[in-house]
UniProtKB/Swiss-Prot annotation:
Any GO CC annotation of this UniProt entry: cytoplasm
Catalytic activity field: tRNA(His) + L-histidine + ATP = L-histidyl-tRNA(His) + AMP + diphosphate + H(+)
UniProt GO BP: histidyl-tRNA aminoacylation
GN (gene name): hisS
EC number: 6.1.1.21
Protein family per UniProt: Belongs to the class-II aminoacyl-tRNA synthetase family.
UniProt name for this protein: Histidine--tRNA ligase
Length: 465
């Protein structure tokens, strides 16, 4: 007999947790749609030459290549060596680039898309790191140009999502790659690849600490003078406290003697984002400037975001993203700038569960169980269930008569809150009895008012959370 087991690096949940996970997906989707984003889904596998055009090195080593055994057999029989190679997507950004380039003339720009699907990476399986995981992305794609105002709107989306998720206080940390690049230019670190390498090291500051970054930048790989490294560390230590302080920090940078044109461009973009964020109604306690945020990916060119939970910094970034100038340069001659964010929901959910932050009030998606006393009561039970479902109550029917105590036990174990009973006495009076297992109360209600009464009870419970 084969031992049942899941592959390493996958997250498989029991129904109680899956409901909580699904609720988070629903909240994210609802907020994405409220801000006018349209749903997109792309195939789980892509042609490998398309998928891997922009990648290489570590990314390519993590890709899962796939091919059907039938296709391989047919190719072997026919001697066809041109069988297209397929690969599972490792993020949602590259498939988006392909999608926009392929459908460019059918889309309306700026194109506002959200995508919530699983992606696959052959990473080393470890706690909290998955080979299959959900990403929940939004992007706004422009044609030729895209106003920095969209960068502010994306920040407002982040705030709306995590406010409704109610997983604790959070901070949206903002920076701009032009601001970083301009400051490094003023220190003589202007060469492209070298500057990108420094940015990657700076991005490790919160995870590895100042001593690690200092040793790395002074060391043989970079050889930056110690005095300049200290200036870099002082610069990236800047954190704003409130909206006015953020604007003051930017004004001071702009007025500095060593301020370069690139730095001033970054300051101007951040200033406009901050002013619009305030107009969008995001409270100043929800965001701050953090000059150490660089985002390790090379394609970010302007605004960058990272979001963290205030009381659980050990969880790390729960949402990140930024501005890029040319999404689909490998697939289209059109210039397609954009801005977007991604929520790695599988890892976030795992971290929240480990920290005890998952709300388990809804142990089941079933809200009512219609009990069955005897075979003669089956038609009545089915009629009651029909009425409940028509009234918006998720309902299960007990299909075989059992002792009422066992039916209560089943409902309690399954996490079903209400048990509806209709014996001969209740039927004669046109009512049903309802056992509320959450409040440990029993009451009677007319059949016509049953669904509306349960909806009120459920709404009151949600309001108390």
């Amino acid at each position: 007999m084969i031992k049942p087991r899941t592959p390493p690096g996958t997250l498989e949940l029991l129904p109680r947790e899956q409901i909580a996970f699904q609720r988070m997906l629903d909240v994210i989707r609802r907020n994405y749609e409220r801000f006018g984003f349209l749903p997109v889904e792309t195939p789980v596998f892509e042609l490998s030459d398309v998928l891997l055009t922009k990648s290489g090195g570590e990314t390519e080593r993590q890709v899962y290549f796939v091919q059907s055994t039938g296709a391989l057999a047919n190719a072997a029989e026919s001697g066809d060596r041109s069988l297209p190679e397929m690969a599972l997507r490792f993020d949602l950004t590259v498939p988006l680039a392909r999608y926009v380039a392929e459908h460019e003339h059918e889309l309306t720009f700026p194109f506002r898309r959200y995508q919530m699907q699983r992606v696959y990476r052959g990473e080393r399986a470890q706690r909290g790191r998955f080979r299959e995981f959900y990403q929940c992305d939004i992007d706004v794609i422009g044609k030729d140009s895209l106003s920095v105002r969209y960068d502010a709107e994306v920040l407002a989306v982040i705030h709306a999502v995590f406010s409704e998720l109610r997983i604790g206080d959070f901070s949206i940390q903002l920076n701009n790659r032009n601001l970083l690049r301009g400051y490094f230019e003023s220190l003589g670190v202007a060469e492209g690849e070298r500057q990108l390498a420094v940015l990657r090291e700076v991005d490790k500051l919160d995870k590895r600490g100042a001593d690690y970054v200092r040793e790395t930048l002074v060391g043989e790989g970079f050889g930056i003078p110690a005095e300049q490294v200290e200036k870099i560390l002082a610069f990236v230590a800047v954190r704003s406290k409130g909206h006015d302080d953020a604007l003051a920090q930017l004004a001071a940078l702009e007025a500095a003697a060593e301020s370069s044109e690139t730095l001033r461009a970054g300051v101007a973009e951040l200033r406009e984002v901050l002013q619009l964020v305030q107009a969008l109604g995001v409270p100043e306690t929800a965001y701050c400037l953090n000059f150490s945020i660089a985002r390790g990916l090379d394609y970010y060119t302007g605004t960058v975001y990272e979001t963290t939970l205030t009381d659980h910094p050990q969880i790390g970034s729960i949402c990140s993203g930024g501005r890029y100038e040319d999404l689909a340069s490998h697939y289209s001659k059109s210039k397609l700038p954009g801005v977007g964010i991604s929520i790695g929901l599988s890892r976030l959910f795992w971290q929240l569960r480990e920290a005890g932050l998952i709300d388990g009030i809804e142990a089941s998606s079933v809200q009512a169980l219609v009990a069955l006393m005897d075979e003669q009561g089956m038609p009545q039970s089915l009629d009651i269930a029909r009425r409940l479902r028509a009234g918006g109550i998720n309902t299960e029917v007990q299909m075989e008569p059992k002792k009422i105590g066992k039916q209560f036990q089943y409902a309690a174990k399954a996490g079903i809150r209400f048990v509806v009973l209709a014996g001969e006495d209740e039927l004669a009076r046109g009512v049903v009895a309802v056992k509320d297992l959450l409040r440990e109360q029993q009451f009677e209600v007319s059949r016509d008012e049953l669904a509306s009464t349960l909806l009120v009870e459920l709404e009151q419970s949600r309001a108390m959370v």
